[in-house]
Amino acid sequence: MPELENPFQETLLSRHRAEPCTVVIFGATGDLTHRKLIPAIYNIAACGDLPPQFKVVGFARRDKTDEGFRTELEEGNRKNSRQGHNDELWGSFAQCIHYHRSEFEDLEGYKALGCLLDQFDVERGAPANRLFYLAAAPEAFKPILEMIRAAGLNKGVGDKWARVVCEKPFGKDLATARGLNAVVADTFAEKDTYRIDHYLGKETAQNIMVLRFANSIFEPNWNSRYIDHVQITCAENLGMEGGRGGYYDTAGALRDMVQNHLFQLLTLVAMEPPTDLSADSVRDEKVKVIRALRPLVGPEAVGKNVIRAQYTAGSVDGVSRVGYRQEDRVNPESKTEPFVALRLMIDTWRWQGVPFYIRVGKQLPKKATEISVHFKKPPQVPFATSTMLRNSENTLVIRIQPDEGIALRILCKQPGQAQNVQQVKMDFRYSSSFGKASPEAYERLLLDAMAGDATLFARRDEVENAWKFIDEIEHAWHKSDNPPTMHEYPAGSWGPKEADDLLRADGREWRLL
């Protein structure tokens, strides 16, 4: 009998080669362009993967020349390029960068942009694809999209495409997400809309599907029969640096991190195998996970399963930190949470009875994002001591950042006559196994958008179903007569005691990072 083909042997990491393209970045004078987007495009060029006859146009309100814009971007590239900065390569690369000044609401500015794009096509001798990247503030998305449509830039020239990439946050609740989706749908087809979440561009996040479905030692055990619980932690050791307090105080950890980044990781861990690796097949399974989340409705259910907290004054790495309400641009009476922990249940056959614990917070002891899958303990270990039995669970740890990799914790006998058993770690690290640093998330995602692969981008129904779940928690916090308590924790700790109690009530505890 012939061996069945494994569809995951051609993995999500397959390389793409895009056709000639112009990328237009709206909000090009902002931090994202300088720290992430231009260094990512430069790294793609350094690897030889940039499409031929490539162009970048920065679209923003400030007066700048092409040369002035290039000089500013060069400074950011020196600080942030994964490949390091090479003056000769930059000199060649910078010639593809141009600047276009316009207000976001000025139709004439978009018509002039269209003329510039047409001029590039004339210089190439043929039309090129066009990728519009919305890196501006969220409130600017609507006028930008409306002006793109009014200027006729949402249609490709000839047989070439026009696509849009939308940065997070994509709305601030279900109503605004639906409204924004409607505006996007009026301008671009869903197949040409790419809602970006940079966590999905990280190598280890992409590897979750391969780890699960291409390795027979894991998939048969990836269910409630063998898995006790799953933890997802995103810890940050910073607060509101860089003037983020103004934005963050209108969002909070639940909206800023859980609704997008951590739900994306959750769906990759919990999804069923897709029928193939097409974008919609993968995203169909991810949406099913979001829809299967057991709703948390009302203050009682939210209070029992969700812990929110603000940090008070403390120290991180020996540096004194002020409390959240004392941060610059934060309301002194703020009800916004920089820390949240959740206990979630997924009502599917595979995950019945398996809790998923999620926590994210600022001013914690270290910066780290990881997923830990905790397997059930064996029913009996004849040679085990009671102490060893308490620590006998096998754990699969997927490190998203830093030091991307995967570790499996197992039990082994210590050398010697006695039957002493100790937990040891089998560790895979990208840097040591492949001998080079992983590509930055934005490198992969930009190439995918240019190549037309939407697998690692959120679909409309995925975004809206995630907001539907989050809105119930926000409603219990801010619109109920008896809202759950806002707890506190000192900066430099691992969060409030109540977050520990959330697991202790189930006979579990957070994994030490």
Located regions from the model:
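Secretory/organelle targeting and membrane-embedding segments
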Residues: 1-166, 170-513
